[in-house]
């Protein structure tokens, strides 16, 4: 059995581990998983059973979340939490920002050696051209 390259830590982030991380926070993943574009981190749109998710914004899909897995050694937990706090502050001021979900009193979580956060899934909209 080969071991993942230590220079490529995301090689260990399998679809099964992504779904398990989401389910570990009490959401019921339905098996849908789509990788999204991200240069530094790994970001996925994950389907969840609607009854396991309470969205706070009407723009959010009721049956999907976005999971952002942070690159190891790039940012400290404090830096990530500062970014999350700022996004939550903007959301509280009713600015259009998808802030991280607060689950069990925190926005930053760990699973399988990876730090990650969950966000409401906001689909894109048509631009306002006036």
Regions found by a protein language model. Give the residues of each.
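ATP-binding pocket architecture of kinase catalytic cores
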Residues: 48-130
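Alpha-helical protein-protein interaction elements
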Residues: 2, 31, 36, 108-111
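Residue-level detector of alpha-helical secondary structure
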Residues: 17-24, 42-45, 82-89
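Detector for Asparagine
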Residues: 3-5, 37, 41, 63
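ATP-binding glycine-rich phosphate-binding loop
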Residues: 25-53
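Juxta-kinase regulatory segment immediately upstream of eukaryotic protein kinase catalytic domains
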Residues: 1-32
């Amino acid at each position: 059995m080969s071991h993942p390259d230590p220079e490529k830590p995301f090689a260990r982030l399998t679809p099964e581990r992504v779904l398990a991380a989401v389910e570990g926070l009490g959401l019921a993943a339905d098996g849908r998983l789509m990788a999204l574009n991200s240069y530094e981190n790994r970001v996925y749109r994950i389907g969840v059973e609607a009854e396991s998710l309470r969205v706070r914004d009407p723009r959010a899909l009721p049956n999907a979340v976005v999971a952002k897995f942070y690159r190891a050694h790039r940012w400290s937990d404090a830096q990530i939490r500062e970014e999350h706090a700022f996004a939550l502050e903007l959301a509280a001021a009713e600015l259009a920002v998808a802030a991280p979900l607060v689950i069990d009193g925190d926005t930053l979580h760990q699973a399988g050696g990876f730090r990650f956060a969950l966000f409401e899934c906001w689909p894109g909209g048509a631009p306002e051209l006036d």
